Amino acid sequence: MPRFKTYRKLLEQIHGPSSQLTPVDQVQFYAKMQDIYSCFYVVIQTLEITLRNKIHQAKIKHYNNENWYENFKAEPHCTFNAKRIINAALDKVDKDFKSKSINYESQDVLARITFGLWPEILKATYREKLFWQIYGSEVFPNKGKVKLSQIDDNLLKIGKLRNRLYHYEPLWKTTKNFKNFNELRSVVDEYFEIIMTLIKHCSLEKYELMKQMKQPEQFKTKMDDLFLFLSKTP
């Protein structure tokens, strides 16, 4: 089990090599890490849906077209990757609705567009265009003085994180080494904070909802629980 070996390696890194680490310790550590990962699902899904809907509404206004992705795809600054993502969504919706004998709507296409399109729309070549000058404050009404380039960088990070999460892979690069628990916590904490900040940039309402649902508290509690487990492991 290659993935389990990754967690065993991590446990040895942050705990220190010990002949007293048992298979039970390793399984419990793996389970606690998965429990921590579960905290990311709600916030990532909230970010994805909120950002998707914000861009969708702004693009409809910009092109005066519900099927704005067709206009965007035809623009010279639309990247190859953006076209690939849009075409994949269109192919999928065609396939899904082919046997239903009903027409699909823009929302059906939108639901099949993957997270990777949103950083593409924030690429430097596109940030210079009129869209972000007019609609930037509608998509990210609470970003303050944060630059779109920084938001783009963070979306790219979270996109990679999302892919690892949904493929049951470690949230960090497997080549990364940690000297102790604090280093691991710093990395995982940063990911969670980035997601919460991006949600806040898009919608204060959704940000407050995450707090009301105690998502940050649950995450902190599970990280504290992992620390307690490690401190008790021989």
Where are these regions (language model features)?
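Extended intrinsically disordered or low-complexity regions, especially N/C-terminal cytosolic tails and loops
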Residues: 1-153, 157, 172-234
